[in-house]
Amino acid sequence: MISKPDKNKLRLKRHKRIRGKISGTAERPRLSVFRSNKNIYAQLIDDVEGVTLASASTNDKNISAEGSKMEQAAEVGKALAETAAKKNIKSVVFDRSGYLYHGRVQALADAARENGLEF
């Protein structure tokens, strides 16, 4: 019997393929996105040193739990861009972690761009 492909396995395969090609530095960190059913998380990572420079998620107290998931994702993107601006980070490499550039991932990216991050 032909089995249906596991979406998360395929996403992880795409993520590994993408991660082999992109890497973040202190000057241009990697903006990594993780999307769960309930929340969305984003962080700026310096892969050379192996440290997280900034992060934001829907679990943060300053991000409203009201509104749709798309609106919450946009708030996360805005909060991350503001945190990056305080740390003088203007340019990033976008890592969508194997997710399609659509919906919440796109909303987060667009909000980050509108608030000053370049990618």
UniProtKB/Swiss-Prot annotation:
Gene3D superfamilies: 3.30.420.100. InterPro entries: Ribosomal_uL18_bac-type (IPR004389), Ribosomal_uL18_bac/euk (IPR005484). One of its GO terms (molecular function) is structural constituent of ribosome. Keywords: Ribonucleoprotein, Ribosomal protein, RNA-binding, rRNA-binding. One of its GO terms (cellular component) is cytosolic large ribosomal subunit. GO terms for biological process: translation. Part of the 50S ribosomal subunit; part of the 5S rRNA/L5/L18/L25 subcomplex. Contacts the 5S and 23S rRNAs. PANTHER family: 39S RIBOSOMAL PROTEIN L18, MITOCHONDRIAL (PTHR12899), LARGE RIBOSOMAL SUBUNIT PROTEIN UL18M (PTHR12899:SF3). This is one of the proteins that bind and probably mediate the attachment of the 5S RNA into the large ribosomal subunit, where it forms part of the central protuberance. Belongs to the universal ribosomal protein uL18 family. This is Large ribosomal subunit protein uL18. It comes from Lactobacillus gasseri (strain ATCC 33323 / DSM 20243 / BCRC 14619 / CIP 102991 / JCM 1131 / KCTC 3163 / NCIMB 11718 / NCTC 13722 / AM63). The lineage of its organism: Bacteria, Bacillati, Bacillota, Bacilli, Lactobacillales.
